[in-house]
Amino acid sequence: MDFKETLLMPKTDFPMRGNLPNREPQMQEEWKDMNIYEKVQARTKGRPLFVLHDGPPYANGDIHMGHALNKVLKDMIVRYKSMAGFHAPYVPGWDTHGLPIEQALTKSGVDRKSMSVAEFRKLCEEFARKQIDRQREQFMRLGVRGDWWNPYVTLDKGFEAQQVKVFGEMAKKGYIYKGKKPVYWSPSSESALAEAEIEYHDKRSPSIYVAFPVKDGKNVLQQDEKIVIWTTTPWTIPANLGIAVHPELEYSVVAVKGEKYVVASGLVETLESALEWENPEILRTIKGVDLEYVVAEHPIYGRDSLVVLGDHVTLDAGTGCVHTAPGHGEEDYIVGQKYGLDVLCPVDDKGYMTAEAPGFEGLFYDEANKPITQKLDECGALLKLTFITHSYAHDWRTKKPVIYRATAQWFASIENFRDELLRAIQEVKWVPEWGETRLYNMVRDRGDWCISRQRVWGVPIPIFYGENGEPIITDETINHVSELFRKHGSNVWFEWETKDLLPEGFTHESSPNGQFTREMDIMDVWFDSGSSHQGVLVEREELDRPADLYLEGSDQYRGWFNSSLSTSVAITGKAPYKGVLSHGFTLDGEGKKMSKSLGNVVIPNDVMKQLGADILRLWVASVDYQADVRVSDKILKQVSEVYRKIRNTYRFLLGNLHDFHPATHRVAIDQLNGLDRYMLAKLNDVINRVKKAYDEYQFSTVYHELHNFCTIELSSFYMDIAKDTLYVKHADHPDRRATQTVMYDVLVALAKLLSPIIPHTADEVWKHIPGVEEESVQLTDMPEPIELGDVSELKQKWDAFINVRDDVLKALENARNEKVIGKSLTAAITLYADGDVRQLLEELGPLDKLFIVSAVKVAGSVADAPKEAESYDDLAIVVEKAVGETCERCWVVSPTVGTNNEHPTLCADCAETVATYYVTK
């Protein structure tokens, strides 16, 4: 007789290998066929609503690891919430306006000048929609569940209509105004930029010190004295109209080689070195406040340069006397307004010097640095020229430097509702907590928001002008334009006559002849996405404002978190979100920024083709995402190994439940032995800790808890001990059915708990679990702890046993190394124990099964142990070769092998089992 046939070995169709790159797309097709998103929504309808509002990625190009990190984090939260008592719809979105799409079309050979604005905008829309299709497919391949075929898109008519309403409401409250002031200007994009569109890179710039002769010293300075300024932008010298000093700083008149220079006293020593002054002599000192209204002379043009007071002046660098060009700097502009200085800006849209900079007109601003510096040298005003490398503002799209340039722009006046913004920030839950301080400080210190852009692909600013140039924004015009956009889209602004965009019969006192024009600038794209709380949360019936959560990268404190807060507080007085969660950036394995030139870019599509989406998702769960995270082939390989262990755990559990049907085979809790109840108690602990971690968005805790549970509590402990019961006992043995009961509960819980992280694998497991009714684990709820009563004593006892077992395993390993035994089933152990350990050993049983050896004897106290015994706390262990023969069926070494004539190669237990259940009588 082949005794292997009498062993109940694991049987399952659940494959050992995940083969995720092939199996996941099949699973996703099944989800699509069963309308899984709609089914989840239908199942949870009526529960408390949880809205995670999707910050829209830009519709251009393939997704990168930052996208993958972001979307998987969102998906894990939404999946968990829908299994944890909430109704959690997820509406993905896309940001579709702006320069990158214009540039992509131009690069592809589209000649913008050969067509109308409306025609070009139609091409932009076509391009954006193709990009959405491309990215949607990739996001869905990640296993992200959402309303993918009904997303929100910022170019959709309904969204644009709501955006116009937001603008109109802000205008109605007096928050929108037009002004000429310096804004970030990108010559490469020919447009104003918002702070969120700026990034910093190192740039080499000239560093010059320039002397401005005193023209009218106001009895404080003399005409032979010169005020020294420092700048790294010589091209702005033609725009100089003033010199700022700090009212509370002390200034010195310093004599050097017959010249007299005015600089901050605190910088004399630094300047002595920087300007190579020999034996400088301080002639007198003056308070900054006393220098106000002194008139200096522009070294090139001879015009007045007024000395003004400014709190922005510091001793950090320069001379303490700050070159002031109101057309080229925010602080310069503010102080210039105070003193009535003109806003001179001799640079055009493309960055070329205009006729307002005589002698330099037609030069690109950066190229004007050299001739301007040479001219200053000719005038005898240049004291020093060097070059420095410093961090400088660049256009985030073109990667080219930007300048400050005063132009006529539309602004949202943050000043008018700054206090409301700051109050709203304090009412939001921020994770990490430092997010609150970061945004609070940004909002506290930020200037007004420049919302106009000199481009064509975007939502037009819905403003008309009367015959006298007066801007017209009324409830009537806003509502009418909003309805036009809802019906026809915003392209009509560029296609129709102005009169056709106005309400029928519209009149206004600024246009006695009924003639009107319209604004041709578009809105900043941050106004688009920043209006999504209105365009999506209010517009869509299944959502609500405020959202429960906004979750984006930490760069969005100055981007979407900020713009959304600004528009929402402006029109509702409240933040659009109850909570904000931010994540870090994705770096390579060494913590370096990914770049094509370094060859260290990890591409999500490649990872999914090679390893599968569940591996990428498991990586997301494994990292501390609130800081910057690392990813590389090596790291993903380590995650794959963890996945393999989890999958093996699933497979072992399924394999040993092949003949278990919960309806008929489940054993009642009170019928379970101590070890089985202990395992369920450990499962309860894991369920509680994992659900708490999910609630707190601590996914790495979920990952470690479940990985450790699979490898330590299950594989290395319970499943190891359970094998004998599962394989050797007959099918319906109460101990075997009890073990299967525990395994079943563990399996169902593990499928549910891991479902938000590895949904493809969890659903694959679910299909193989006997007795489950739901067609997908996604249509179930998170597991609840099993009612076990008070288990504190039980846990204490078995925790203590695990410590004893660890000591026994060490002793067995040492005996194996010394060739005393082979496998642990060839061993017999004698235990000498004192105190609690002895009591524990006497209470537990059968010890040979628990230690997975052939024989265990509990002898005297530790003091009685022979010298060769291995000693541990309150325990000494002797390992010997077990006496008897090896049973052919269970591999235990037993003196009872050979005592049964029918089955002489079996131990007594196996002989009885075989005779009773497997021999035909």
UniProtKB/Swiss-Prot annotation:
Cofactor notes: Binds 1 zinc ion per subunit.
Cofactor: Zn(2+)
Signal peptide: none
Pfam families the UniProt entry points to: Anticodon_1, tRNA-synt_1, zf-FPG_IleRS
Domain of life: Bacteria
Biological processes per GO annotation: isoleucyl-tRNA aminoacylation
Motif placement: 'HIGH' region: 57-67
Binding site for Zn(2+): C887, C890, C907, C910
Keyword terms of this UniProt record: Aminoacyl-tRNA synthetase, ATP-binding, Cytoplasm, Ligase, Metal-binding, Nucleotide-binding, Protein biosynthesis, Zinc
Record-level GO cellular component terms: cytosol
Binding-site residues, ATP: K596
Free-text note regarding domains: IleRS has two distinct active sites: one for aminoacylation and one for editing. The misactivated valine is translocated from the active site to the editing site, which sterically excludes the correctly activated isoleucine. The single editing site contains two valyl binding pockets, one specific for each substrate (Val-AMP or Val-tRNA(Ile)).
Complex formation: Monomer.
HAMAP family: Ile_tRNA_synth_type1 (MF_02002)
UniProt-recorded name of the protein: Isoleucine--tRNA ligase
